């Protein structure tokens, strides 16, 4: 089972042409693992959250491909489309939790971690091309727009952005080609990250 790639913190957003930039949603990191009819949700800390977030599980079962691993962030979205960490953390909205999917680590029995990110993103888009509710592919921008995107994220009160090099493979642990730049005014900046509620 794949472990998690983790971004390094930075103060400056990469601006080269080979970088993808994603808005950082404020949620819990999860991998969705499907093997036939069996779906599991694995947290970054190794916990099993399969029974906690039924919408994600039901959606994963509806996807036509029946063997895959996707990486993403479990979120509760407000009416404005912005992730609401307090609603997620409270546990009162577990039936509404969706997955913001940003990577695909395996599909149809093939390990995709050695593929470049750009190709993994293409595979993820194909997997989710029917736009199943409950799991959605993370939008991203490419290239020089990164610093401008970060400024806009801060203006809208979002957590920040994560920038990833399009040609790099997926490695467990801290990755210098995944760079997180956080909005210092956002509550998540001072909060201990990815702390799941007690089971």
Per-range role (PLM):
Residues 1-199:
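Catalytic cores of nucleic-acid ligases and guanylyltransferases
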């Amino acid at each position: 089972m794949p472990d998690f790639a983790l971004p390094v913190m930075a103060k400056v957003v990469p601006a080269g042409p080979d970088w993808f930039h994603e808005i950082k949603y404020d949620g819990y990191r999860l991998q969705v693992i499907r093997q036939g009819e069996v779906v599991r949700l694995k947290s970054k800390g190794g916990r099993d959250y399969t029974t906690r977030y039924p919408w994600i599980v039901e959606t994963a079962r509806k996807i036509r491909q029946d063997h895959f691993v996707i990486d993403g962030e479990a979120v509760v979205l407000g009416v404005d489309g912005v992730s609401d960490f307090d609603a997620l953390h409270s546990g009162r909205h577990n039936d509404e939790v969706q997955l913001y999917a940003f990577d695909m680590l395996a599909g149809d029995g093939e390990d995709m971690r050695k593929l470049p990110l750009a190709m993994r993103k293409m595979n993820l888009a194909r997997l989710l091309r029917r736009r199943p509710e409950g799991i959605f592919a993370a939008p991203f921008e490419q290239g020089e727009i990164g610093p401008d995107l970060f400024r806009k994220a801060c203006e809208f009160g979002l957590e920040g952005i994560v920038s990833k090099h399009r040609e790099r493979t997926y490695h467990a642990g801290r990755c210098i080609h995944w760079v997180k730049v956080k909005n210092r005014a956002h509550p998540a900046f001072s909060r201990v990250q990815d702390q799941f509620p007690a089971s």
